[in-house]
């Protein structure tokens, strides 16, 4: 037989080792170029989903007061919200207390949902997925060991909105900042687009459904009261009383954009980053509360 019967062309022999290494190198370079873009796309998609969730919560919040003679839904702080869940009275918008243990202070599993699903507010926001930011994937090792894959809630309500406790001695004033107004009816909010109602709260800071912000804009506070979350590449989701949502980018990596410790929140004094930290705090303060007239 001729030579053509027992020889192969180069195309039939496949890649040489050098050619294969070149292809692998090109793929690695392309992957390195694409990964940052894919990461940014994921962050943007999660932020969009977060805003959709908070908008739905705001629609529910608005429908609630429409059906209840203009009264805003209750927004109990500790220990009142915990007692609402334990006593099965469920009168706050969210009655569960978040933490890093497998169980809450009463021995109930941390992923129980009745504090949300049995509340009157749930009639208007009847999807448990709505209460969690898609970027909130944090569970502690204890929770993971107990089979808990997600905590129920990422959002908290501005502490200047809704009744703080079942028996409010001075319903017109905030419990923690008594020279500031407590909004109990929607008609008392002078500029709904200027005040936030819901926001992401940092995983180490979140407990009850109540977020306390220092509302003073004339004197810079020493540190955060409750810490907003920065799930979205240093940014936090806020939803306002007129129903709109936005993602706000914070500045301070020393005081505001903090990692998750799966323990008590580490509130860093603004003196550690006086320009950016104070700017972050004042942005929230300007949109949190209103002095009593």
Regions found by a protein language model. Give the residues of each.
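Short, Lys/Arg-enriched N-terminal segments with co-localized hydrophobic residues
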Residues: 1-4
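Amphipathic alpha-helical segments typified by the pilin-like N-terminal helix
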Residues: 6-52
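Short, well-structured segments within or immediately adjacent to enzyme catalytic domains
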Residues: 50-293
């Amino acid at each position: 037989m001729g030579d053509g019967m027992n020889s192969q062309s180069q195309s039939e022999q496949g890649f040489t080792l050098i050619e294969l290494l070149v292809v692998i190198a090109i793929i690695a370079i392309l992957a390195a170029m694409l990964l940052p873009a894919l990461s940014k796309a994921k962050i943007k998609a999660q932020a969009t989903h977060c805003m959709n969730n908070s908008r739905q919560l705001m629609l529910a919040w608005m429908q609630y007061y429409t059906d209840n003679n203009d009264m805003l839904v209750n927004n109990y702080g500790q220990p009142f919200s915990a007692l609402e869940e334990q006593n099965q009275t469920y009168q706050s918008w969210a009655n569960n207390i978040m933490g890093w243990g497998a169980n809450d202070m009463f021995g109930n599993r941390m992923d129980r949902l009745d504090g949300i699903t049995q509340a009157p507010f749930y009639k208007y926001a009847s999807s448990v997925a709505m209460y969690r930011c898609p970027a909130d994937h944090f569970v502690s090792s204890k929770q993971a060991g107990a089979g808990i894959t997600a905590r129920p809630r990422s959002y908290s309500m501005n502490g200047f909105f809704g009744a703080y406790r079942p028996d409010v001695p001075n319903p017109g004033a905030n419990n923690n900042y008594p020279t500031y107004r407590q909004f109990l009816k929607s008609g008392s909010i002078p500029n709904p687009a200027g005040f936030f109602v819901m926001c992401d709260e940092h995983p180490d800071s979140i407990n009850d459904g109540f977020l306390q912000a220092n509302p003073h804009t004339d004197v810079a506070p020493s540190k955060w009261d409750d810490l907003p979350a920065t799930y979205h590449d240093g940014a936090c989701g806020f939803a306002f009383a007129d129903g709109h949502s936005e993602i706000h980018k914070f500045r301070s990596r020393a005081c505001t954009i903090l990692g998750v410790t799966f323990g008590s929140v580490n509130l860093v004094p603004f003196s550690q980053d006086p320009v950016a930290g104070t700017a972050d705090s004042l942005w929230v303060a300007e949109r949190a509360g209103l002095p009593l007239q």
